[in-house]
Amino acid sequence: MKILVITMAGIGDVLLATPLIHELRANFPDATIDALVRWPAGRDLLDNNPHLNRVHQQDLVQAGKPAALRYLWSLRSERYEVSINAHPQSQRLYRLAARVIGAPVRISHSYDCFGAVDRLLVNRVLPQDYTRHTVENNLDVLPLLGAGLKLPAHALELFLTPDEEKWADEFLAENRLAGQKLLGIHVGSGGTKNLRLKRWPLGHYQELVRRLNRERPELRILLFGGPEEKQDHQAILAQVPGELTREAKTRNFRQTAALMKRCHAFLSVDTALMHLAAALKIPAQIVIEAPTLNVTNWPYGHSFTLVKNPVINGRGLDYYRYDGGGIKGTREELLASMAAVSVEDVYRTLRSSI
């Protein structure tokens, strides 16, 4: 059997598909199991995964329609027998990709935006469930293949190499961070749709870091992120002592993971790095409530502390659903909702956690 797992939404969603990938291998040990991802960081997360044969990576949106179609058509030659669109790929583009690739069995969840056209693109469908985590929604597809749960437990899986672990240790040694208590912070969020609006304000992060440097000088703060966060990192670093706070300069997502693994605590909104922190079992994980957070995308299999947002107040599904669209609300409303989480609330949570 040849199976293709399509997981082309967020980078974190790739990580949320790893329990399904492991179950597929447990159920079909002799199958060829490949994955198709959108982002290079998604490929990084699946590199070295022993349950996969290959990982295909292509940004279909950036490639443009002709190039995207040519790429998907080239995958038809693989003659996959089954394709699985992992949760929560609500946009029709991903089901169209499955149809072009052409596996006879094409599995997907149905979403709020699911219609007659979608039923022409995929042929085995089950409803998504907002009361259950994305990992569990993914595992629900197994009976559609005549399969079931074979593993005694499930976890987000990332397989770092000894060289990557060594690199992280050398980074700490070179930056005089070995043996220090480390707090990782990710100031960013997804850049598609209007997901940048769920970021906690930069000014709040600046005030928080200054206060931590002043009142918790034993902590060493590492700022994680990619090119999109570079400007924010520079704004924070310009106001604080360099020996207490620094940028985690990594070349790829796997180095980021290896370095995050050394952290004692991690702070973010719901992002790919939030899911990565859960996968790495960082001892103290703190999540600021944003309008996209709901039961389906909490940190999976890992305890965390939520800094509650007085505006969102557990009503994430009123703001964001898997309907192919962005966060509901005006730019001003969403920015104000995130500004409503005070620096004092986050500092107090951090102080009690580390």
Residue ranges and their predicted role:
Residues 1-354:
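Catalytic machinery of carbohydrate-active enzymes
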